[in-house]
Design a protein with these regions (language model features):
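Generic hydrophobic transmembrane alpha-helix motif, especially the helices
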Residues: 109-145
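C-terminal transmembrane helix and the adjacent membrane-cytosol boundary/short C-terminal tail
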Residues: 14, 156-160, 171, 195-198, ...
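Periplasmic/extracellular loop-to-transmembrane helix junction in inner-membrane transport proteins
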Residues: 2-21, 36-79, 97, 235-249
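Transmembrane alpha-helices
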Residues: 155, 177-214
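Hydrophobic positions within alpha-helical transmembrane segments of bacterial inner-membrane proteins
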Residues: 28, 70, 74, 78-90, ...
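Interhelical loop and adjacent transmembrane-helix boundary motif
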Residues: 54-57, 61, 211-259
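Amphipathic cytosolic juxtamembrane alpha-helices at the membrane-cytosol interface
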Residues: 84, 88, 92, 97-101, ...
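Cytoplasmic-entry segments and transmembrane alpha-helices of multi-pass inner-membrane transporters
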Residues: 17, 84-123, 150-157
Length: 277
């Protein structure tokens, strides 16, 4: 074995060890966080906690209204944000060319980097102030605005992965461009688009700042979209900054529920990404 081979083996061993160390540190930190949340929250977690509404300071009460409110907000934001994001992504991939397409792409990239609290303030100015009250609708719009650029960019990238031979074959058969896009390209990219949608939902499910300016929060179960609505993130925030130990314990339990929700969404994403073109 000459010196060159020895140097290569040493370099390979060093890089392999460094990669393994980084992996252990990243996974270890995640496991520590998850374990600590589970340890702190499991004591207050029970069935009544999941279905009851909050009570004044003391024993009892739950996060049933916050769970339902979070689901309403996620559903509302998905109804608004997912179709819009997919349409923007299809435009950028299949149609958008020239300066206008570049401008749309620039706007989408800019929206991706805007802090969520800025989005909340924007929706507060255009919806909450004219309506003169907080509402679930405003919260859903704020989350949808955060969701759109994520879905748009993911959709664009997934559509670009579709082989050009599929497009060319459909066009050669005489199909118009719009039918090729709807009937060939989008179905081929559907697993990737669904993955992007789930990632966007997971992303907005942990948002707090925009909801403080829009949905605000409530101690009651939601009945309409035109009233303030509770959410897990806002309730965790309110309980965490309170001076009461009982609310601190419930904040940990609510965090465990939220973490389980996000992990469940990520598992679904992993299952969807197993499919390939």
């Amino acid at each position: 074995m000459n010196n060159t081979d020895r140097i290569r083996r040493v370099q390979s061993a060093i890089m392999t060890g460094a990669t393994a160390l980084c992996t252990v540190l990243a996974v270890g930190a995640l496991l520590i966080i998850l374990s600590y949340i589970a340890w702190q929250g499991i004591g207050s977690l029970n069935f009544r906690f999941l279905i009851d509404s909050p009570k004044p300071v003391g024993e009892g009460g739950g996060i049933g209204n916050a769970i339902l409110g979070s689901l309403v907000l996620l559903g509302l934001s998905s109804v608004i944000g997912l179709p819009l994001g997919i349409c923007v992504g299809v435009y950028l991939s299949e149609i958008g060319r020239g300066r206008f397409g570049g401008a749309v792409r620039f706007i989408v990239d800019t929206l991706t980097g805007i802090p969520s609290i800025v989005t909340g303030v924007f929706v507060y100015a255009i919806l909450v102030l004219p309506m003169k009250h907080f509402s679930a609708l405003a919260g859903g719009v704020a989350l949808a605005l955060i969701m759109v650029p994520i879905v748009a960019r993911t959709t664009e990238e997934m559509l670009k992965l579709v082989p050009h031979s599929l497009r060319e074959g459909a066009l050669a058969l005489g199909a118009p461009q719009w039918r090729v896009t709807l009937g060939v390209v989008i179905p081929a990219a559907a697993p990737g688009i669904a993955t992007g949608a789930m990632l966007a939902i997971a992303r907005v499910s942990g948002e707090t700042a925009p909801l403080l300016f829009t949905a605000f929060g409530s101690r009651f179960f939601p009945t309409t979209l035109d009233e303030p609505i509770a959410s897990l993130t806002v309730q965790i925030y309110n309980y965490a900054i309170s001076p009461y130990d009982e609310w601190h314990a419930q904040a940990w339990a609510a965090t465990l529920v939220l973490m389980t929700l996000v992990l469940g969404i990520n598992i679904i994403v992993r299952v969807l990404t197993r499919r390939r073109f």
